[in-house]
Regions:
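Terminal, regulation- and interaction-focused segments at domain boundaries
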Residues: 1-27, 35
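Conserved active-site and cofactor/substrate-binding residues in soluble primary-metabolism enzymes
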Residues: 10, 14, 60, 94, ...
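N-terminal intrinsically disordered, cationic/polar leader segments
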Residues: 25, 38-39, 81, 107-108
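Short Gly/Thr-rich strand-loop-strand
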Residues: 32-41
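Beta-strand/loop substructures that line and gate deep hydrophobic ligand-binding cavities in soluble
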Residues: 57-90
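A conserved amphipathic terminal alpha-helix motif
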Residues: 86-109
């Protein structure tokens, strides 16, 4: 598992679109598997689960992206999983780190 978290300022909807477009257009095998959105008392939470094939690992892996805002800055959490091939411990997590690099590039550009 790999994790990336940031606190950002800006437009929630614009950031969410940028993340979705950037991930889906940044990898030939990336797909948006599921979405969830909550609004309550001015707070907003959006969850996106992406999946892609890792050529280096020879397997599929997922990335869950959560955005949360309650009137102030936007909190971002991205977690990747599924890149290991071992049964009892994690080895070969390059695919997870590479997938996470996609969102880092989107956020830090």
């Amino acid at each position: 598992m790999a994790k990336y978290e940031r606190t950002l300022n800006g437009d929630f909807n614009g950031l969410l679109r940028r993340i979705e477009d950037g991930i889906l257009n940044g990898s030939f095998s990336a797909s948006l598997e599921e979405t969830s959105d909550f609004y309550e008392n001015g707070a907003r939470c959006s969850v996106r689960v992406f999946e892609r094939y890792s050529y280096t690992g020879g397997n599929r892996l997922s990335m869950s992206v959560t955005l949360f805002q309650n009137g102030g800055p936007i909190h971002l959490s991205a977690v990747t999983s599924g890149g290991s091939q071992a049964l009892f411990f994690k080895i070969n997590t390059w695919g997870e780190e590479t997938f996470l690099d996609c969102i880092k590039k989107i956020i830090e550009e």
